[in-house]
């Protein structure tokens, strides 16, 4: 029996859970349940990520303490996870004594080995709010192209990256005040000292997905930098211990103590389980799972989003190795969620909160749909509402549940719920049993979409068998009563096997199926067992079809969520940003039609797409725009795409912009994308029928 500890990334305690979050928690939960079903001892822990400036500011805006703020959000998160059947063994908070003790211990060990250094850092400071400003709280004019209202790290217009101190006419988005430069002593974790270790660690077989490992090699080539692990007061978090007396308090940056939260949640669970004799909740040893000398005894896996690979595959293993703790056995990254082919949108009603979805639709619908889309690759998945409705209705209602519903009626009506004493089709049942090995392997390898396809193939065989035997016709013929019972017994047994295979994805459905089948066990090992001479209970509908009206109501409610729940903090930030604008700017929200017609949008095809050496946010494109010579375009989308993802794609390019000289060359156009450069950009691609060189009108 393998001993496995599993974590999901910690949701930030600053707002509700939405469907984008749920991709990860559903993926992890399915994997955990699948491994538990195969009799492994698996422990799944998580916690709220409860520190940082954003939480401090939101609490202030809401008129509560940070502790009250995070307690309210934690309760909301736990309620949402419960609705979606996420089966944590423990759900904790990074604002805990366990996390404080472990964070301080790791820091002290790193410091004791000389892995911590200090240096003075010049930062922008908000004189009205009395705090140093992170890049996201500073806006101004791009130092390269002059575009207004650009964030403090990169320009959304020309793609240039820069330091916040380089912005022209900067202002604080928190107060509207003009920030001033101040110097502060910061503490750094010397990541370059672990470069040799990390180069090997990231190449170890099974540690990372190949695409992630390849991405990390690029970062190694660019050179690792020391990591700033401190923040100045005021800050909601843990004070850094052992700082020189008389110096201002320093706090751990949220990304230092957040991953330590995995350890803290597990340690908290170990305390809860101390002395336990319950085999379902066994006693656990913290040291067995976290000490370096025990890393071959137990396994540790992190499920994360692709946007936080840098922290989990570089900083985190280096911190652990430098403080005498074991490193993860594997770090598994997933892509982002798209809805109807686009980034989630509040205005379109596709930025859907977990609570809103559960109000209108069975959460297990989403669990199945995500499972049907997820693979072991780092790929975005698309929740297409039409496909979602069709797949759930066809696969789950029309195929799987239909096997039971079309057979159970005969068994109840004609045989008082009793199944046949023998199996009329042993080879068919054995075929379904044999499929279990491949399904189990697909689950373990996180190839959930493959597992769902294999399960649906089994369901198809069951329905084909029923259709070929036609028990409804047999039932009308005198003397064929035994045949009807035999056919329905085979169907019910296949249904039982399918419930074994679907249990990790649909735990509530399988619990209801247990009640119908009058059994207690649907573990993976039980797939060999047959229900013969066994009495089942009266069938009740196990899953309802999705109606378009339910989806429409959910989307409408999501739009109302946008209108009804703007946070006080969001209002304050919006007002602060507006304070720096002139009345003229506020009156110029509209442009003339003639101005719009000046923009030349052209169908372009990507001939080449490459990384830009020395630019961590740019991709370089060679585009065919239907003219004699292709054009060169730089686009700030590197963190959202690998070059090969865009090869040969047809895109929209603004082709009458004045060429812009940049550090890396001349950009002769602009590729159109949708979304937020902070969280995810989606390049707008066109169907093959669009002709290169055509203009959009």
Curated annotation (Swiss-Prot):
* Recorded name of the encoding gene: metG
Organism from which the protein derives: Psychrobacter sp. (strain PRwf-1)
Q: Which SUPFAM superfamilies match?
A: Anticodon-binding domain of a subclass of class I aminoacyl-tRNA synthetases (SSF47323), Methionyl-tRNA synthetase (MetRS), Zn-domain (SSF57770), Nucleic acid-binding proteins (SSF50249), Nucleotidylyl transferase (SSF52374)
The protein's annotated catalytic reaction(s) are:
tRNA(Met) + L-methionine + ATP = L-methionyl-tRNA(Met) + AMP + diphosphate
Descriptive protein name: Methionine--tRNA ligase
Q: What class of enzyme is it?
A: ligase
CC cofactor note: Binds 1 zinc ion per subunit.
Segments carrying motif 'HIGH' region? 11-21
Could you give the subunit structure recorded for this chain?
Homodimer.
């Amino acid at each position: 029996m393998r001993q496995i500890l599993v974590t999901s990334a910690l949701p930030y305690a600053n707002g509700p859970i939405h469907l984008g979050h749920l991709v990860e928690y559903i993926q992890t939960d399915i994997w955990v349940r699948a491994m538990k079903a195969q009799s492994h001892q698996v422990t799944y822990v998580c916690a709220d990520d409860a520190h940082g400036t954003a939480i401090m500011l939101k609490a202030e805006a809401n008129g509560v303490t940070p502790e009250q703020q995070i307690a309210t959000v934690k309760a909301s998160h736990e309620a949402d996870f419960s609705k979606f059947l996420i089966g944590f063994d423990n759900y904790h908070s990074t604002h805990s004594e366990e996390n404080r003790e472990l964070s301080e211990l790791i820091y002290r060990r790193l410091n004791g080995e000389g892995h911590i250094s200090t240096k003075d850092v010049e930062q922008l400071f908000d004189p009205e709010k009395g705090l140093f400003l992170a890049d996201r709280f500073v806006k101004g004019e791009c130092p390269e192209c002059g575009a207004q209202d650009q964030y403090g790290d990169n320009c959304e217009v020309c793609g240039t990256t820069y330091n916040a101190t380089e912005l022209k006419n900067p202002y604080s988005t928190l107060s509207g005040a003009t920030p001033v430069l101040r110097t502060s002593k910061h503490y750094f974790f010397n990541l370059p000292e672990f470069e040799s270790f990390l180069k090997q660690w990231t190449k170890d077989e099974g540690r990372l997905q190949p695409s992630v490992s390849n991405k990390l090699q690029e970062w190694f080539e660019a050179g690792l930098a020391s990591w700033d692990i401190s923040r100045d007061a005021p800050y909601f978090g843990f004070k850094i211990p052992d700082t020189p007396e008389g110096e201002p308090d320093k706090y751990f940056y949220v990304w230092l103590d957040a991953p330590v939260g995995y350890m803290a949640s597990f340690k908290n669970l170990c305390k809860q389980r101390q002395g336990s004799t319950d085999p379902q909740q066994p006693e656990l040893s913290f040291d067995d799972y976290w000490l370096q000398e025990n890393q071959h005894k137990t396994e540790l896996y992190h499920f994360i989003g692709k946007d936080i690979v840098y922290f989990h595959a570089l900083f985190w293993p280096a911190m652990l190795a430098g403080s005498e703790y074991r490193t993860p056995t594997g770090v598994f990254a997933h892509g982002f969620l798209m809805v109807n082919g686009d980034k989630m949108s509040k205005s379109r009603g596709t930025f859907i909160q977990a609570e809103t979805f559960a109000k209108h639709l069975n959460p297990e619908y989403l669990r199945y749909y995500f499972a049907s889309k997820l693979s072991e690759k780092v790929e975005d998945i698309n929740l297409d509402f039409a496909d979602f409705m069709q797949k759930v209705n066809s696969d789950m209602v029309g195929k799987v549940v239909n096997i039971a519903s079309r057979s159970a009626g005969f068994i109840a009506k004609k045989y008082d719920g009793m199944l046949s004493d023998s199996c009329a089709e042993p080879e068919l049942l054995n075929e379904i049993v044999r499929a279990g090995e491949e399904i189990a392997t697909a689950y373990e390898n996180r190839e959930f979409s493959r597992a769902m396809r294999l399960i649906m193939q089994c369901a198809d065989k069951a329905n084909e068998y029923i259709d070929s035997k036609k028990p409804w016709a047999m039932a009308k013929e005198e003397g064929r009563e035994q045949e009807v019972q035999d056919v329905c017994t085979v169907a019910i047994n296949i249904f039982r096997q399918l419930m074994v295979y679907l249990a990790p994805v649909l735990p509530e459905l399988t619990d209801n199926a247990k009640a119908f089948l009058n059994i207690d066990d649907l573990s993976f090992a039980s797939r060999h067992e047959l229900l013969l001479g066994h009495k089942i209970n009266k069938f009740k509908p196990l899953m309802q079809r999705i109606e378009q009206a339910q989806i429409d109501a959910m989307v409408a409610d999501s739009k109302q969520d946008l209108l009804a729940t703007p946070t006080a903090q969001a209002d304050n930030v919006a007002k602060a940003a507006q304070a720096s604008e002139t009345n003229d700017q506020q009156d110029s929200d509209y442009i003339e039609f003639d101005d719009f017609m000046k923009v030349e949008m052209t169908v372009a095809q990507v001939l080449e797409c490459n990384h830009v050496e020395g630019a961590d946010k740019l991709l370089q494109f060679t585009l065919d725009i239907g003219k004699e010579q292709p054009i060169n375009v730089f686009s700030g989308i590197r963190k959202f795409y690998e070059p090969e993802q865009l090869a040969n794609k047809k895109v929209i390019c603004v082709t009458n912009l004045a060429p812009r000289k940049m550090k890396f060359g001349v950009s002769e156009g602009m590729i159109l994308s949708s979304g937020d450069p902070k969280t995810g950009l989606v390049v707008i691609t066109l169907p093959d029928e669009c002709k290169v060189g055509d203009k959009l009108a």
